[in-house]
Amino acid sequence: MGTHEDTVRTLETELGLVEQGFRGLTAEQWATPTRLRPLDETKPPWTLFELAGHFDISIGLTVMLMAEPQSGQVGRDRASFFIFPRSEVAPVVYDYAYTMVEGKTPEQMPEVLAATFAKTVEGARSMAPDTVGPGYYAPMRLDEFVASRVVEAVVHGLDLTDALGRAPMCTPEGVAVTAAILDDLLARKTVAGRPPDLADDLAWVRAGSGRGPAHPDPRLPLIG
């Protein structure tokens, strides 16, 4: 596990790639559906417009954590953040992306994301790693929350490039952080140990997050 500064640097790089990925999209591309499937299969998948809204929410949670430092017992870490009842959480996350982009245009979203990403990175770099604040489900340390945002950036970055038919843009460092968190998550949710055919970190991230062909291992995917 690297230092907090290493993780912040990795997050900064991943978010920069995501921001650039959204810049310059045509109107048709903004309306491109992602491959994500809502829990309610009667609803449409997010387009890249709603995906951008989700990025603003999920990364912006870091800003909220830093804005409300608190004392008390930490309730989650970088891996356990992703343990939740999908039937309860997924519909809320799905709907909130639509709420986030309401009143905005696709052309505005790159600047919206740039502002949120900059606040996140600047704050994470300037505040103590052991700062505790609201981590959505429970209080979390800043360093643990930042690591969980790398997962968000890498996995949803795959959603962006997959929808556009582009090669993945995530860095080896970002993929390594994400893969390690998924390894930990696998051990906590079921039985530790990746399937032997998923030694490659990017292949593991795709299978563990459901961003690829369905894997026959019944333990997967770990996150949706």
Model segments located where?
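Conserved alpha-helical segments that form or flank metal/cofactor-binding pockets of metalloenzymes
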Residues: 49-92
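Short alpha-helical functional segments enriched in proximate histidine and acidic residues
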Residues: 21, 58, 62, 123
